[in-house]
A protein has these predicted regions:
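Non-catalytic alpha/beta scaffold blocks inside enzyme catalytic domains
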Residues: 1-232
Length: 232
């Protein structure tokens, strides 16, 4: 909804056509119908609509924030701008600077308020959005980094992996329980595996990349001894 009400969109280090097709479709819709300008820091490739690349470096974000380029004037003249940042941009060494300085910049110019939020992060996994909603993950909480440091240093004695997990875990003396339907990295190193159905084999509520809760009805029944997640 915010995308459809925006009068300017700035993409930073993301390719919504590949990372979030529905978001990209919404952007294309407003670009075609309302002719709103779309800009990008970084070259995302073919997005199926017109956009202008205003730079490819962190310096270009600095120039925007400090009103040191022509685009800064264009951005500040808009009433409802939207910035969409990709996770890949936040994974850079300058990622924390990018996020914090943009927040300060947008708050200063009242682009973040109860009525409008100009700052958006395009997560690469829908589960990231759900974990943020549950306050299990935050882009600003230092405890997140402490957790990953402890994981890398094998400081945990017990790990419970729920669902498909793409974490790089070097098993040492941890006791690992894996609950899920796919034989991913977590299942390979688990001491105990609790088989559960795939999402197509059980009813459930899921949060998508836009933060919308969607209901899923099972299309088939699980095989073998697999039990639904809530029963486990």
């Amino acid at each position: 909804q915010d995308i459809e009400n925006a009068d300017l969109i700035l993409l930073i280090g993301c390719n919504p056509r590949h990372e979030a097709t529905m978001v990209n479709a919404r952007i294309r819709k407003v670009q075609v119908q309302k002719k709103i300008p779309i800009y990008s820091i970084g070259d995302p490739g073919d997005l199926s609509y017109r956009f202008e690349i205003i730079g490819e470096q962190t310096q270009d974000i600095y120039n925007l924030i400090n009103n040191q380029n022509e685009f800064s004037k264009v951005f500040l003249s808009s009433k409802k701008p939207i910035i969409i940042i990709g996770e890949s941009a936040l994974e850079l060494k300058s990622g924390n600077y990018i996020l914090e300085e943009l927040k300060k910049f947008l708050n200063t110019h009242k682009f973040i308020s109860e009525k409008w939020n100009a700052l958006n992060v395009l997560a690469q996994n829908a589960s990231t959005v759900g974990s943020i909603d549950l306050n299990l993950l935050s882009f600003t909480n230092e405890n997140n980094f402490t957790f990953f440091d402890n994981l890398e240093k094998n400081n945990f004695k017990f790990l419970y992996l729920l669902g498909s997990d793409n974490l790089e875990i070097k098993k040492n003396n941890e006791f690992i329980v894996y609950q899920g339907s796919h034989g991913d990295k977590g299942a390979e190193i688990a001491d105990i595996i609790l088989p559960s159905p795939a999402y197509t084999e059980q009813n459930g509520l899921y949060t998508n990349l836009e933060g919308r809760v969607q209901e899923c009805r099972k299309a088939s029944y699980p095989t073998g001894v697999a039990k639904e997640d809530w029963k486990i």
